[in-house]
Amino acid sequence: KPIPVFEIHGTNDNISLFQGDIENKGGWGSYYGLPETIQFWADKHNLDKNEYIYIASKGEGDQNDIIFERYWSEDNINEVWLYKIVDAGHIWPGFRIRWWQNPLLWYYMGSGNDDISASEEVWKFFKQFLSEG
């Protein structure tokens, strides 16, 4: 049964690499990159329409633009969404880390992004697929 797919990912994530780590050099397990994974699910669900929306950073504390990719079809309910946070690390958008509060965490995770709330975007996506009963 097809399932909807939602992903938010920083392009400079040094924990879960955007381009993947098939050879498991990072020790987190082998995995494909986001471009291949998103395309796999779009193809698997026969999603023949897509759009790319560029969202310029408007936050004061970050300069991370967002590229929103949406794949869908008029023939089925499934969709695939990807929020690509440009130059961002392993962080949850809407959550901010100030470097002076925790320099080590800021170094590894990035400063965050306040242009979107990941929690709100996740809910907006998945509430479309709720069924009655």
State the predicted function of each range.
Residues 9, 32, 86:
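Residues at the C-termini of beta-strands that transition into short coil/loop
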